[in-house]
Amino acid sequence: MAKRSRSEDEDDDLQYADHDYEVPQQKGLKKLWNRVKWTRDEDDKLKKLVEQHGTDDWTLIASHLQNRSDFQCQHRWQKVLNPELIKGPWTKEEDQRVIELVQKYGPKRWSLIAKHLKGRIGKQCRERWHNHLNPEVKKSSWTEEEDRIIYEAHKRLGNRWAEIAKLLPGRTDNSIKNHWNSTMRRKVEQEGYLQDGIKSERSSSKLQHKPCAAMDHMQTQNQFYIPVQIPGYQYVSPEGNCIEHVQPTSAFIQQPFIDEDPDKEKKIKELEMLLMSAENEVRRKRIPSQPGSFSSWSGSFLMDDNMSNTLNSLDEHTSEFYSMDENQPVSAQQNSPTKFLAVEANAVLSSLQTIPEFAETLELIESDPVAWSDVTSFDISDAAASPIKSTPVKLMRIQHNEGAMECQFNVSLVLEGKKNTCNGGNSEAVPLTSPNIAKFSTPPAILRKKRKMRVGHSPGSELRDGSLNDGGNMALKHTPLKTLPFSPSQFFNTCPGNEQLNIENPSFTSTPICGQKALITTPLHKETTPKDQKENVGFRTPTIRRSILGTTPRTPTPFKNALAAQEKKYGPLKIVSQPLAFLEEDIREVLKEETGTDLFLKEEDEPAYKSCKQENTASGKKVRKSLVLDNWEKEESGTQLLTEDISDMQSENRFTTSLLMIPLLEIHDNRCNLIPEKQDINSTNKTYTLTKKKPNPNTSKVVKLEKNLQSNCEWETVVYGKTEDQLIMTEQARRYLSTYTATSSTSRALIL
C-alpha cells in the first residue's frame, strides 16, 4: 500500500485551491473556522442560498450564515450537498477510468483525477483505488498470523489503523479496521481468541532492550560464543514445543517489501530486534545463572570426523564456553530439561586447535583412538566426590572417528573438581550399548534443546542418578528389572492367617493405593504414615469388612427391575395354587428337598434323618398333568407292607427313611362310592415300607424329628392327595378309567 502523505490529504480536502483561492490565505483562515458540525437547518439554508446566488460568490453566501466562513460553505457544498455528487456504488466504467488515470498521473494527484470523473471527489477516488483497485491489495481470507499481529498492534497503538497497516503489507487500513470491528473484536473479547498464545509472549516482551545488552556483553566476554539467531532454524523448548510465533514472524519480516519507505523499514527492523531480544530472553531464562555448577541443565557436544576431547581440556575450557550471569542465584534442586549443543567439527575445530592443551590432546587421541575410547582406563578422583551429592549427572557424548564409540562423561564432576582446585581431568566414561550414532545434516552452530524424560526420584534413585558411591565407582548403577512369570496380584490378594484385618490396617491389594509405594523386587513394608496425614486420604475408598454387612439375602438389582417391569405390565404377581395331583417323580423330588433324604431309596449307610433345608422351593412349578394308576395295581402284590404304629417306632429309636405312599385302589371295578376322608388318612398312616436303620446317637435331633413329624401331618395330607377337592378329582379319574379297564387290558396314564 502506497503511503499517503499529508500533502495528498490537503490536496483532497482543499479542492478550492484549484479555483479562486490560494492555499496560504486559507491556512490563515483555518483558525477562525467554526468546528461545530453542520446542522440540518444550516444545510437547508445553504442549499437555498446556492440556488439564489449560485456558486460564484461564497463570501456573500457565508454572510448569511452565522459563524461559517466562505471556505466552509464552499467545502460543504462541493463535498456533501451538491446534488451532482454520486454516492452510490462504483461502476465498471468508473473503475477502469480510475485505473487509467492512476497509471497516467500517479496514485497521489486525486483532485486532478476526480475532475475527469463526474460526480466523484478526490477522496472517493483515493479510497476506491487503495481499497479495491490496487493490484497489491490482498483480497484473500485473513490468516491466524495476521490476526495475531493485528491483536498485538491494536493493544499498543489502539485505533491507529494506518500505523497498523504498515505491519501488514497488502492489507489496507480500512480493511483492517473493518476486520477488527466486524469479526476480531467479538472473538477476542467474548470467545478468548488468541488469548492462550499471547500469555506466553508477555513474559518475553517485558524486557525488550535488556536482553540485547546482555547478548552483546556475552559475545564480548566469551570468544567461543555462538550466535543465537540462525536463519531457517528454530529452537525447541524444554516441553518439546517450539517457539511457534518466532518462525512465521521471522519469515514474514525477512520478506522483501515493494515500497521502499525508510520509515517502514525502520519499523520492521525495530520489530525484528524486539523479536530477537524476546527470543534471547527466553533462551537466557533456560540457562542457569551460576557458572560452573551446571545444576540445572546438561550440555552435550556432538562432534564428527577428527573431533575428540578429553576431560583435562573440559576442566579448563568448558566453563568458558558457557558464559552465564553470576548475579542470579540458582537452587541446586532445580532440574531444567537437558540442552544439547550440536556443533560440527569444522565450525569449532579451528578454534580449539589454537589452545595448546586441545592440540596435544587431539594428537594423542588420533594416534590411538581405541585406547582413548576404553572406559576402564579412566579413574575418578576422590576430591570430586564430596561437593556434588545433590548435583545431577551431566552427560557428555563424544564421537570418535575410528572406534565409533559413544561415551558419557560426567561433566559436573570435572567442574566441581575445578572449583575445589583439584585435578579433575580423570573421570569415568560409560560406553553406550546402542551402536547408532547421531548424524546431523543441519548447518553448523545450531543450538538445540532436546527433551529429556525425567521420572520422579525417590531417595534411592537420587543416589543412582546423580551422586557418588563411597567406593569411588562412578558407573551408573540401575537395579535390573526382569519380567515375572506370575502375576503379583496373586500375592496381593491373599491374606495371611495371622494378620488381623481392619479398616485402619488394610491388606495390600493389586490396586495401587496412594501412599503404599513398593517396588516389585523389594519386600513389602507396612507404611508408618498416619492415616490423617496421607496425601489424598479424603478420596480413598474405605476398606469394608464383610462381617459388618448384614446376613440377610439381597435381591439382585436386575431381578428387582424385572419384577418391577412385570408388575407394571401385567399387574401384581399372584401365587399359583397347588396342583391337584402329582407324578411319582415330582413327589419324590419334593419329599427329598423337604426331608433331606430320598424316601424311595433303601440305603443302609445314609444318616437317619436330615434337617429341613428350606421352605418349599417347588411351589412355583407347573401343575402336574398325569397320574399313573394302573402300574400301581400290578406292583401291589409284590410290595411288603408293615403296619406298625409311629409311636412304637419312636420308642425303639428307629426312623422311617423310606415312606412309600400307596394310593387306595379299587378292588372291585364297580365300586363307586366315595371313601371317607378319615378312613383314607388312617389307612395312609398305617401303610409304610419300613427299613431298619442304625440308631442316631444325637438325641437333640430326635426331639426335632418328632416336632417335624407332627407338623408335617397337614402337609402330608396335601401331598398325598387327601384333601376334599383332591379326593373328588381322584374319584372322578377312577370312574373315567373304569370304562377302559373293562374293555382293554393295556394300562394307560390319564392326562388331565
UniProtKB/Swiss-Prot annotation:
GO terms for cellular component: nucleoplasm; nucleus. InterPro entries: C-myb_C, Homeodomain-like_sf, Myb_dom, MYB_TF, SANT/Myb, Tscrpt_reg_Wos2-domain. Residues 58-81, 110-133, 161-184 bind DNA. Expressed in a variety of lymphoid and solid tumor lines cultured in vitro. The modification N6-acetyllysine is found at residue 394. It is found in: Nucleus. PROSITE patterns: HTH_MYB (PS51294). Residues 30-81, 82-137, 138-188 form the HTH myb-type domain. There is a cross-link at residues 199, 592, 602 (Glycyl lysine isopeptide (Lys-Gly) (interchain with G-Cter in SUMO2)). GO terms for biological process: cell differentiation; male meiosis I; mitotic cell cycle; positive regulation of DNA-templated transcription; positive regulation of piRNA transcription; positive regulation of transcription by RNA polymerase II; spermatogenesis. Residues 1-22, 451-480 are annotated as: Disordered. Keywords: Acetylation, Activator, Differentiation, DNA-binding, Isopeptide bond, Nucleus, Repeat, Spermatogenesis, Transcription, Transcription regulation, Ubl conjugation. Residues 230-295 are annotated as: Transcriptional activation domain. GO terms for molecular function: DNA-binding transcription activator activity, RNA polymerase II-specific; DNA-binding transcription factor activity, RNA polymerase II-specific; RNA polymerase II cis-regulatory region sequence-specific DNA binding. SUPFAM superfamilies: Homeodomain-like. SMART domains: SANT (SM00717). Residues 298-553 are annotated as: Negative regulatory domain. Component of the DREAM complex (also named LINC complex) at least composed of E2F4, E2F5, LIN9, LIN37, LIN52, LIN54, MYBL1, MYBL2, RBL1, RBL2, RBBP4, TFDP1 and TFDP2. The complex exists in quiescent cells where it represses cell cycle-dependent genes. It dissociates in S phase when LIN9, LIN37, LIN52 and LIN54 form a subcomplex that binds to MYBL2. PANTHER family: MYB PROTEIN-RELATED, MYB-LIKE DOMAIN-CONTAINING PROTEIN-RELATED. Transcription factor that specifically recognizes the sequence 5'-YAAC[GT]G-3'. Acts as a master regulator of male meiosis by promoting expression of piRNAs: activates expression of both piRNA precursor RNAs and expression of protein-coding genes involved in piRNA metabolism. The piRNA metabolic process mediates the repression of transposable elements during meiosis by forming complexes composed of piRNAs and Piwi proteins and governs the methylation and subsequent repression of transposons, which is essential for the germline integrity. Transcriptional activator of SOX30. This is Myb-related protein A. The lineage of its organism: Eukaryota, Metazoa, Chordata, Craniata, Vertebrata.
